[in-house]
């Protein structure tokens, strides 16, 4: 069929809606015509008619149609450029229509006329720019490329503009086109984008029906979960999983990474800060729905990570289960990337830095991260740099405002009073709560610290059972950290006096079953710092620190009489790089704890406790464990951990008061000449120190 007859036939087919097979033929014929037409007027006519053709736009899947239109012009542009290069190399019959890239692009752009909508023009311009310039093809001249870029930006801005009573352009196609072209636009072209209008449109496209469907895809999983021989199975061919795989193939979902970068650029360059606050509300609403669908509509949410291998079939774990969490992580990465742009903007924008706005931005960001924590808390998924910046910066901002911090903690405080929740998701939220609370006590009044931090943490300190699951271990450690953060604040001295005895007893009862030697030593060292100068509690309750030391020394002596207390403890998990590699027992750890506390003791008891610690060192029977403790004793003396006064006392004690002998030998050794003396010999008088 000649090219002119094909053009006539395609223009006729444009007038009616057809079945899928005929529609695919129309797409293919249109691509062939765009590639081979030699008359620019025919190119413009074909483009103009395509943009109003019922055969194209009468299809039910609008986003798929938009994607296909972009694909048509992208493919045609690639072929036109390829034909142009071939024609330049070989003389003879011309390949294609014979038009150069600039002339072809100009003819196509003219076809985007007033009969069609601006957002439809944007799809055409996107296909042309992608086909000519992506992959470093550099097909267009500098002037024509600037023209096409300007056409893309102008069409996008006009499509996004609110122009009553004309209905606003659908957000999905505009966002899809800009998502494809953003990386190809020059800085000057990007600067012309209407970011204030782009943010709500891109957010709607990303989170709504054209993108992540408001998280409803999670709600259908429970229907397809079946029980098979005391385990649950979720088949790969189930409707819910097939829907998720189809969802991943959506253009906007498969391009979540570039889309988050597009939104990030718009956030950084928007003029109206209110659209950023509205964006945060949209993110909170979406992540809240995602969490609710997972919690309410899915029985699999009742499984802890450590229980998955028990209750799920191996095929489910390696198939649908892994695929689901992989997709959820992609969603989480995109949401966090957008939140990171908001947080970065809030550090520079004076309107977002105001005292009545900054804590609101930080709290909204933390609400979003809390809703995503059931995803980000799996297997260290929250350890990437963008997440840490977003999380820690929001905490730093919120912690400066005591009232806002208290209000935020009150809003997300665990509902269960004094009992550990049964549902794993609730425990996950408690873990997020404790991790956040650890950073906020500095500007909270003592009453708020007690109510909002100490009491929720005590729930996990007093109800810990052995052995702990990995998640319960995280909660237990976070509860310790939260309590220590409260005790470390000088203004919380009234709470410290009441809590320290209870907390010390909790430490002793938890070690070594629930906390490692390093964790025990660090926690006790922190408590000793809190009870020592310059903290005010050191003056009001000077006996408290020494009482705790007596408890440690007593526990060490008890452990020395117990074979289990003398035996080396199991090595820490290899995944924890902070754990010491030297062998330790319960007894040696307690003695090391005594030594760690020495630099913080008051001067009037400092020397006495050095002697007591030295005696405790030599009560350790295992020589290898004892040598580890001796090295630590020497390290405390010489490493600069002590201030000038304590260091001077320590040097004198080591050199002239028997400290060296007490540490190294357990007692001052007898002189050889006193052990063997000739009968009738004169004894040598003791020489005093000349120092």
PLM features: what roles do these ranges have?
Residues 1-56, 623-624, 628-629, 658:
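N-terminal alpha-helical scaffolding segments that mark the starts
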Residues 10, 108, 457-461, 503, ...:
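Buried hydrophobic core positions in alpha-solenoid tandem helical repeats
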Residues 25, 65-68, 334, 428, ...:
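Alpha-solenoid helical repeat scaffolds
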Residues 34, 73-80, 125-133, 181-182, ...:
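Hydrophobic residues within the alpha-helices of tandem HEAT/HEAT-like
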Residues 39-469, 608, 626-627, 643-652, ...:
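Extended alpha-helical scaffold segments
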Residues 260-264, 282-283, 288-312, 336-339, ...:
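Extended alpha-helical scaffolding regions
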Residues 397-434, 467, 475-478, 519-523, ...:
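Eukaryotic alpha-helical solenoid repeat scaffolds
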Residues 426, 456, 461-472, 476, ...:
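Short inter-helical turns and helix N-cap capping residues of alpha-solenoid HEAT/ARM repeat scaffolds
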């Amino acid at each position: 069929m000649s090219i002119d007859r094909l053009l006539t036939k395609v223009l006729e087919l444009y007038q009616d809606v057809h079945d899928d097979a005929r529609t695919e033929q129309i797409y293919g014929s249109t691509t062939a015509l765009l590639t081979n037409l030699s008359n620019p007027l025919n190119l413009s006519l074909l483009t103009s008619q395509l943009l109003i053709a019922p055969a194209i736009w009468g299809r039910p899947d609008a986003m798929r149609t938009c994607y296909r239109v972009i694909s048509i012009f992208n493919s045609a542009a690639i072929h036109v450029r390829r034909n142009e290069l071939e024609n330049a190399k070989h003389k003879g019959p011309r390949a294609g229509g014979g038009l150069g890239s600039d002339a072809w692009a100009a003819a196509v752009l003219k076809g985007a006329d007033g009969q069609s909508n601006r957002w439809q023009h944007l799809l055409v311009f996107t296909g042309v720019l992608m086909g000519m310039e992506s992959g470093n093809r550099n097909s267009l001249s500098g002037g024509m490329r600037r023209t096409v870029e300007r056409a893309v930006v102008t069409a996008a801005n006009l499509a996004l503009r609110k122009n009553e009573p004309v209905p606003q352009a659908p957000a999905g196609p505009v966002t899809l086109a800009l998502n494809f072209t953003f990386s190809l636009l020059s800085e000057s072209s990007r600067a012309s984008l209407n970011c204030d209008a782009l943010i709500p449109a891109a957010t709607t496209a990303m989170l709504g029906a054209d993108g992540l469907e408001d998280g409803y895809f999670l709600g259908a999983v429970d229907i397809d979960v079946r029980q098979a021989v005391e385990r649950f199975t979720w088949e790969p061919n189930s409707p819910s999983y097939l829907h998720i795989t189809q969802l991943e193939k959506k253009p906007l979902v498969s391009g979540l990474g570039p889309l988050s970068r597009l939104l990030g650029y718009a956030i950084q360059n928007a003029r109206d800060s209110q659209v950023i606050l509205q964006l945060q509300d949209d993110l909170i609403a979406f992540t809240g729905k995602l969490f609710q669908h997972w919690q309410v509509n899915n029985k699999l949410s009742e499984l802890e990570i450590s229980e998955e291998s028990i209750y799920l079939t191996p095929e489910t774990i390696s198939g649908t289960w892994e695929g689901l969490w992989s997709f959820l992580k992609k969603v989480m990465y995109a949401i966090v990337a957008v939140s990171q742009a908001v947080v970065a903007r809030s550090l520079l924008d004076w309107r977002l830095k105001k005292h009545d706005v900054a804590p609101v931005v930080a709290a909204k960001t933390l609400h979003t991260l809390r809703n995503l924590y059931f995803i980000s808390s799996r297997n260290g998924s929250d350890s990437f740099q963008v997440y840490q910046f977003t999380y820690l910066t929001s905490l730093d901002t919120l912690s400066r405002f005591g009232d806002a911090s208290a209000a935020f903690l009150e809003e997300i405080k665990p509902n269960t009073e004094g009992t550990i929740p049964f549902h794993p998701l609730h425990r996950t939220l408690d873990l997020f709560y404790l991790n956040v609370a650890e950073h906020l006590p500095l500007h909270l009044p003592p009453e708020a610290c007690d109510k909002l931090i100490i009491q929720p943490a005590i729930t996990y300190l007093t109800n810990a059972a052995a052995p702990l699951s990995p998640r319960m271990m995280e909660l237990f450690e976070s509860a310790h950290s939260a309590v220590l953060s409260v005790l470390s604040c000088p203004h919380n001295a009234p709470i410290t006096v009441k809590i320290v005895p209870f907390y010390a007893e909790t430490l002793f009862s938890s070690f070594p079953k629930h906390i490692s030697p390093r964790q025990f030593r660090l926690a006790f060292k922190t408590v000793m710092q809190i009870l020592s100068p310059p903290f005010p509690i050191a003056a009001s309750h000077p006996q408290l620190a020494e009482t705790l030391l007596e408890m440690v020394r007593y526990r060490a002596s008890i452990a020395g009489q117990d074979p289990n207390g003398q035996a080396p403890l199991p090595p820490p998990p290899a995944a924890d790089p902070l754990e010491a590699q030297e062998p330790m027992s319960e007894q040696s750890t307690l003695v090391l704890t005594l030594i760690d506390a020495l630099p913080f003791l008051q001067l009037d008891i400092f020397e006495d406790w050095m002697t007591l610690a030295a005696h405790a060192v030599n009560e350790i029977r295992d020589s290898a464990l004892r040598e580890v403790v001796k090295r630590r004793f020497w390290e405390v003396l010489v490493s600069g951990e002590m201030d000038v006064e304590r260091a001077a006392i320590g040097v004198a004690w080591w050199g002239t008061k028997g400290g060296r002998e007490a540490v190294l030998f357990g007692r001052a050794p007898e002189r050889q000449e006193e052990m063997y003396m000739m009968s009738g010999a004169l004894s040598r008088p003791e020489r005093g120190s000349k120092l």
